[in-house]
């Protein structure tokens, strides 16, 4: 029984790596997503771009409003806004694209064989496009002063900011792995869990690093505003943290496989099922 299940699991993982799976409506299995495949992939990319756009627009926008209008939002309000917009976009587009919204999350899913590598550059491009468009929108809407910069820069030491980014990004991916890729989890609550994680992370690390957790979230405003101070922190930190979070959850996931098999395959349990695929997100 166990051997047969393992064979099915490996076959499902192999199909994901080759870009094969259910079509857009969860029907016939064909290459990539078909009917036709290009249309389906385009829908995913549009969903990723729109989701990332509104996450950056809302999260960064509330920062600008808070500075320009005398602190009317307050720091707790900023934290809640980030958590809510991520949750809303997961439930809005997760069933279409998987709701990554984060290049580090996309790369991590690919590393652990949860996402086809050939779609990674396209997803990352869509995410950066969404962030750039949102940043341009905010610059056009508001007179953004240097004090109202809506990107991310270390409040003190770059080293402290880097450590903070690694830790909170680790937590983010650990939660995503638990609620969105483990069949034992309640998939319908994934959006709430991820949104609350974002909110808590902003509360804790916001005053230290700005709580990015997402290279696209930081690079978009940096490019639009021309502020690149310690931008490397917001690329290295989230990537290291997210990959580490996914790897650790994979190690502690219950399985009857020996540890050497887990570290060899580095796979996330089973292939993503339609009921869980829409919840695999982040900021």
Curated annotation (Swiss-Prot):
UniProt modified residues of type Phosphoserine: 267
Keywords: Acetylation, Membrane, Phosphoprotein, Repeat, Transmembrane, Transmembrane helix, Transport
PROSITE patterns (alphabetical): MIP
Keyword Transmembrane found: yes
Keyword Transmembrane listed: yes
A GO MF label: channel activity
Membrane topology: Multi-pass membrane protein
Alphabetical list of Gene3D superfamilies matching this protein: Glycerol uptake facilitator protein (1.20.1080.10)
Position of sequence motif NPA 1: 102-104
Residues that span the membrane, as ranges: 45-65, 70-90, 122-142, 161-181, 189-209, 231-251
InterPro entries tied to this protein: Aquaporin-like (IPR023271), Aquaporin_transptr (IPR034294), MIP (IPR000425), MIP_CS (IPR022357)
Pfam families: MIP (PF00230)
Entry domain remark: Aquaporins contain two tandem repeats each containing three membrane-spanning domains and a pore-forming loop with the signature motif Asn-Pro-Ala (NPA).
Function: Potential aquaporin, which may facilitate the transport of water and small neutral solutes across cell membranes.
Protein name stated in the entry: Putative aquaporin NIP4-1
Organism: Arabidopsis thaliana (Mouse-ear cress)
């Amino acid at each position: 029984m166990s051997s047969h299940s393992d064979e099915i699991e490996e076959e499902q993982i192999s199909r994901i790596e080759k870009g094969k799976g259910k079509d857009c409506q969860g029907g016939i299995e064909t290459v990539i997503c078909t009917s036709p495949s290009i249309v389906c992939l385009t829908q995913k990319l549009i969903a990723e771009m729109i989701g990332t756009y509104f996450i950056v627009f809302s999260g960064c926008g509330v920062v600008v409003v808070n500075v320009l209008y005398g602190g009317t939002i307050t720091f707790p309000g900023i934290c809640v806004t980030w958590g809510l917009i991520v949750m809303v976009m997961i439930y809005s587009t997760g069933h279409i694209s998987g709701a990554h919204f984060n290049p580090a999350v996309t790369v991590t899913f690919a590393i652990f064989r949860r996402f086809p590598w050939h779609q990674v550059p396209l997803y990352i491009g869509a995410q950066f496009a969404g962030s750039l468009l949102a940043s341009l929108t905010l610059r056009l809407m508001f007179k953004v002063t240097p004090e109202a910069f809506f990107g991310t820069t270390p409040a003190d030491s770059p080293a402290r900011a880097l450590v903070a980014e690694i830790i909170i990004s680790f937590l983010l991916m650990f939660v995503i792995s638990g609620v969105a890729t483990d069949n034992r989890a309640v998939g319908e609550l994934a959006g709430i869990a991820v949104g609350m994680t974002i909110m808590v992370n902003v509360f804790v690390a916001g005053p230290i690093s700005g709580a990015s957790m997402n290279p696209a979230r930081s690079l978009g405003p940096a490019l639009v505003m021309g502020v690149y101070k310690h931008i490397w922190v917001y690329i290295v930190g989230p990537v290291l943290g997210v990959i580490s979070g996914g790897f650790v959850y994979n190690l502690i996931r219950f399985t009857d496989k020996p540890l050497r098999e887990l570290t060899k395959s580095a796979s996330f349990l089973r292939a993503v099922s339609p009921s869980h695929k829409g919840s695999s997100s982040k900021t």
